[in-house]
Amino acid sequence: MSFILRLKLSAMMFLQFMLVASFWVQLSTYLNNMKIEGIMFSLVMSTMAIGSIFSPLVGMFADRVANSEKVLFVLNLLVAIFLTGAFFSTDPTLIFVCLLLAMCAYMPTWGLTSSIAITNSTAEAFPTIRVFGSLGWVSAAIFSIVASQYFNKTIDGTAIPLACGAAIAFISAVFALTLPATPPQSKGQKMSLSDALGLGAFSMLKDRNVCVFMACVVLWTVAFTIYWMYGSFLQDLGVKNITPVLNVGQISELLFMVLIPVSIKFIGFKKTMAFGIFAMLVRYLFSAFAQDVPNLYWGAIVVHGIIFGFFFVVAQMYIGKKAPKEIQAQAQGLYFFFYGIAQIVATFFSTFLIENIKKTPEVAKSLGCVVADTAASLAKTDWTSVFYNEAGITAFLLFFILVFFKDDVKD
């Protein structure tokens, strides 16, 4: 693989993840400030999950009909248009519709960019390319930092990050046209109805270990999804500049991403993913005690690199190893399909926990909050109990993968 090709694939990942990080990390805070609550809050936060469900269909299109880089161009252009619409919208329903359309176009790009990178490089080189996605995520904090340092303004919790996302989406669309031609692997082959619907990769579920793997993906997503609402947790703790704070997790992701090939080589896929799950258990235990020992939330954020890299990214590598070459894009789409279904359930579940497990103001004050004035806010949610629930799910997942999943592919 040439240096120029590696550079292009790395830049693709950088832009694609900078795009979503620029607005999604602080979206829950923005919705809170807009007084969007209850079912509408859950619907908006589930748009990422709903978008993931379309991944197999887009994967089919890339596998059989059109070049992957051209599909990526169209999708990113649509994202730019719909995020612009969300930026100018003040009505909750319009915000939901615009974000739903934006995420339906955006989420399939996770599997698509992975497929482009793996097709044009190697599975072994993928982590060193994918790490630039983490770097892009971290770099999204530049908008908050510039606004704060040079304009003395706070953009977290406003609509401005949506405009930032739209701008990056447009740049990503243009850049997609410079990527190496990635023609459909199965073009010209006979296509069945299931292929037309992007369901070809579902045949992989005949493999018992793939079924167990997908069950792990579902459970992991159910436990992980509350992290997308971590901004609300930090806001209740009185933390300022939420996006840069959360980006500490992405910095750790950069460090651990480069260790993925080493981990897989020495301990295999199963133990690597199990270690990522264990790190998530540590996150929720730290988070549960953060109201008593505030600085623990830093530990909960720092382990994000292990959680995301050692499970989410390694899981993509595993399904890539298991999938036949002719359905690589659909296989990545299958992964994100299950991820999306689970995230929809998890979003409503997490919202239910946050809105229904409450603590009285008196108990909140007795905790000795980071900022005394936030005691009333902490009364809204008993975050300790919320994170105990998440820790319980994670502990079960750790047991499940260690007992039922088999390490059936070689590095």
Task: Show where each model-derived region lies.
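Helix-loop boundary and gating motifs at the non-cytosolic
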Residues: S2-S52, N209-V245
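Structural signature of the two symmetry-related core transmembrane helices
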Residues: K70-T84, K271-F286
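A membrane-interface helix-boundary motif in multi-pass transporters
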Residues: S148-A167, F352-T394
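Hydrophobic core of transmembrane alpha-helices in multi-pass small-molecule transporters
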Residues: F14, F82, P92-T109, V218, ...
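Juxtamembrane intracellular "pre-TM" segments in multi-pass secondary transporters
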Residues: M1-F3, L179-A215
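Cytoplasmic helix-loop-helix junction between adjacent transmembrane helices
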Residues: L100-F132
